[in-house]
Regions:
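Catalytic core of the metallo-beta-lactamase
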Residues: 1-53, 111-179, 206-207, 213
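Generic, well-ordered alpha-helical segments
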Residues: 33, 56, 75-79
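Short, well-ordered alpha-helical microsegments
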Residues: 57-61, 81-85, 105, 142-144, ...
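Short hydrophobic/charged patches on amphipathic alpha-helices used for structural packing
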Residues: 61-62, 208
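Short active-site segment of divalent metal-dependent hydrolases/proteases
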Residues: 80, 162, 226
Length: 246
């Protein structure tokens, strides 16, 4: 179902100086055809940082490599890692960084995915000059690492915001997505994920407050129509299920 996605697929699309996105998919989750998105950043040292890599494509790899050497690949939460194994095969010198608790998942261990480093709230020296990061916690081992690209004032999320366009979804799903507040303009994560994050609500609210304090101009995330402008206002609306943020 190509209607769910944002063509052209599996190609670099410039967003800001040193920052690109790659739209791909669709993936099917809980019967919903989901568009999926990777973010690509060129760090100050000229190396390339891949956030939530999408399906591997040789031409895409070639185009990214033309920007600089791929040195970092990020699995930002416990759900976004499935395409990394093939990228590792083709980028053997790149380090793979993972959200907390990903390494412990049985499916990940059985896959043979190599995890070189585990992320936390402190940006590592490899990209501290370019990116800030915040771990948003939840129950049941859920963690999502959010990143802020200071030069472009872009916040990079994964599943904390899901903003599906009804016109791109099957007609039968549209009322369900609206009821679940997963479609534009609400842009909330699925109900089960909201429940999981609420299990650690106090810590999650603190983390989200840190993200809002960064005042991002734009917010990129994995699924749906990302916030190209007025990022802080849109983010506050999408995360209001956690509480009121001033």
């Amino acid at each position: 179902m190509s209607e769910a996605t944002y063509p052209p697929l599996d190609v670099l699309k410039p967003v800001a100086d040193g920052l690109w996105i790659v739209d791909s998919g669709p993936l099917r989750a809980l019967g919903i055809p989901l568009p999926v998105r990777m973010t690509v950043i060129r760090l100050r040292d000229g190396s390339i940082w891949l956030h939530s890599p999408t399906r591997y494509d040789p031409q895409l790899h070639q185009d990214i490599a033309a920007l600089g050497p791929i040195r970092h690949m990020v699995a930002p939460n416990i759900a976004h890692w499935t395409f990394l194994k093939e990228w590792q095969t083709h980028c053997p010198d790149a380090l793979t960084w993972a959200a907390p608790n990903l390494r412990q998942r049985g499916q990940v261990r059985r896959s043979g995915l190599r995890i070189d480093r585990v992320l936390d709230d402190a940006a590592p020296p490899e990209w501290a000059a370019d990116l800030r990061q915040v771990v948003v916690p939840g129950g049941l081992s859920f963690r999502e690492v959010a990143f802020f690209h200071g030069a472009s004032r872009t916040l990079i999320l994964t599943d904390l915001v899901l903003n599906l366009e009804p016109a791109k979804m099957p007609a039968l799903l549209r009322p369900l997505l609206r009821l679940a507040r997963m479609s534009t303009p609400d842009g909330q994560p699925p109900p089960y994920l909201r429940l999981v994050i609420r299990l650690r609500r106090r810590a999650a609210v603190q983390a989200v407050s840190e993200l809002l304090a960064l005042e991002p101009e734009r917010v990129v995330f994995a699924h749906g129509l990302w916030f190209m402008r007025d990022g802080t206002a849109h983010l506050r609306r999408s995360l209001r299920w956690l509480g009121a943020f001033g």
